[in-house]
């Protein structure tokens, strides 16, 4: 059933999001840069006169998976087993905890989504934030974008029990390209550079991400412990460090300042700490482009190297900013691959194929070890070329996307 043929007295839609810059940094308290994409999840709703919710996913129904749920306005138990209804229950639970239960009314909701599940494009966040906006609209809750993001985060993190950061929910709620500060009060900076076109490539590889974050966090903790217990480390440096991955003031630590002391730890721990510092520096550089700040050759070479500068120098003037952002993406992909061990041969084939037909840059989007690749391209036609090239090397599916809008009320 196509979205255009479906009806509801209230219709809400929420976007998927791609993990654009500073991947794997939100849980360290560092800023991240998500981008909303054109693929959207639609909620077709009919308000009820009671306090009962019914939810139905046409996509899961089509796959023969559990696709319906019914529950009331109260603190609902999670059914577990990755049941999709738990995300809806989680949103209601958070609102009840916030004292808004008395304002809620029942709704019949049917969901139809363009966002593939498990592809690293935040289908769960689109569901949480979209449902929160539906309740906000129907029940007159007067919730702002940040409220919707925080409710979605609490639903997934605290109610469903997924150890996620806030990247996905904020990216879905605000839309566009944003810089999200990942320490309280979680400031959001909408970035003005929106003339970007992406090819989003689903590798088709489904890898459990449950052990990806804890293993790398453990590596960082091991390295930090070695630094904190070393008598060689200056006290001034230790003041900016800590014993766990989320304690250091990473933005105040320069690689030059710390690199001479990294010999006190094992190679994996060293790689994880270098990754953190280099990824942040790369993102700070890219943010200048996204804010339309002027940068010169010297700064480009310092951040990206001479070889990448040569690629940028050869590009037409009107494409130069896009080329710089593409080279930043390539650089960040290399960091994810070489210092965070998150790539696979099949993912490398997809990245190479996209660059081979003219993408400006390509990188892992999401946790890694599968999921999606995001490639920056000149236009929609070039995006289709990239998708065809990636499909020819084994990718499952692809979409061309401009920068999308955040969660919104379509009608009702």
Segments predicted by a language model, with ranges:
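Glycine- and acidic-rich phosphate- and metal-coordinating loops
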Residues: 92-117
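A short glycine/serine-rich beta->alpha loop
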Residues: 8, 27-31, 72-81, 113-121, ...
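C-terminal nucleotide
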Residues: 2-17, 21, 42-86, 96-97, ...
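DPxDG-like acidic metal-binding loop motif
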Residues: 36-39, 121-141, 374
